[in-house]
Amino acid sequence: MADIMESSDGTILRLPRIALVVPSLAEGGGVPAVARFVKDVVVRSGRYQLKLISLATSSRDSDSRRFVDPASWMRKVGTSTGIWEGLPFVHVGTVGAELEFQRYRPHAALARVVADCDVLQVVCGTPAWANAVCGLGKPVAVQCATRARVERRMRDSDPRSAGAWWRRAMTAITDRIDDRALRSVNSIQVENLWMLDYAKCINKNRQVDLRYAPPGVNAVDFHPLPTRDLDVDPYILCVARLSDPRKNIGLLLEAYAQLPVQLIQTVRLVLAGSSAPPAAFWVHVNALGLCDRVTYLPRPDRATLIALYQQAAVFALPSDEEGLGVVLLEAMACGVPAVATRCGGPDGIIADGEDGYLVDLDDAANMALRIGLLLSSHDANRKMGAKARMTVMKRYEEGVAGIAFLDIWDHLLSTRQNHI
């Protein structure tokens, strides 16, 4: 990527540098997927340089000072390099990595890494991560999906061990850091409407650039087939980290089991993702006599994933909590109608009854009803799938969604220059 450009009067100008700051960039999941979108926005624009920065998320992080590793006490916080999406990134450790809240604190090593950057764009699940780069003399934008207290409510609801109580205490501390970060950054981009309302409430006494700015979808790669054959081996698809309790995959199994017998006999349930459902799920599958009807595909590559979407009869998202639901957008981009719970992100994406269906949390009966409607009427299925594709093209296609980010960075740069 070129780092200079020539102005109309022949002056050579340095392109401003955007630091894309992401917790554990090399890991999979929703956050790196959003980071990939933001990275592409920067690269396609030709208006900025890009610097990728990965933050420590593990208590065993080798670049960090660790309380349990006396040999690390006297050395500086380290950095290491890697390649992500064909581009170099810098991984930065922290001080006291065993304590979650320490990972959200600014420190000298991180300040040195961002010193040559003009805008710091943080992409994260919960906004606490932005606190790590606040106060370093650079404008900070944070793109976030949820709050730690909301994201972890199922995990922390019934602590029964010392470790569980410890994690619950870390959540309480992180919740306060979430709020501090939202009050400190210069720009906030959220992925769902409830988080938009919360960020407005937190910032009611100050002016901040606050927007609903979800990531976009590559609608060229994720596209519908000319025709979907709903008669030959139809299946319901769910894509998720299926071991995560928040994905509530058991709800989808309950809904599937409540479908009319003739549909169960002809329509399979296909699950795909980076982690398999827990053992208890498969015990339940066996108890329901559905072993030959439920399939799990581990870690499908991109081409396989797109084909899974394109050929699905219905996409189902049974989650208890979703900051956005990128998989939902990918399915809709492929012209597949979706049934999703009102779990946060989908509430702002789907117009219920128009381009998909929304059902209440833990409502297996209504999920089964909506899925059954889409399986029983091919005409309704195709019409809703076409509307789903239109929704993505109007609001979530990556070029459309990227405009908000470019505008935010331009505004932060102009504001910074006015204060220099």
Language-model features, listed with the residues they occupy:
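Aromatic "clamp/platform" in nucleotide-sugar-dependent glycosyltransferases that forms part
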Residues: 320
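Nucleotide-activated donor-binding/catalytic signature segment of Leloir-type glycosyltransferases, i.e.
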Residues: 282-303
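Short alpha-helical donor nucleotide-sugar binding micro-motif in glycosyltransferases
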Residues: 299-300, 307-312
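Short hydrophobic beta-strand element within catalytic cores of glycosyltransferases
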Residues: 337-340
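Conserved donor-binding/catalytic core segment of Leloir-type glycosyltransferases
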Residues: 228-247, 253-256, 270
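Conserved acidic donor-binding segment of nucleotide-sugar-dependent glycosyltransferases
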Residues: 351-353, 357-364, 373-379
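Glycosyltransferase donor-sugar binding loop
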Residues: 58-59, 239, 268-282
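Membrane-proximal helix-turn-helix segments that form the acceptor-binding/catalytic region
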Residues: 111, 165-188
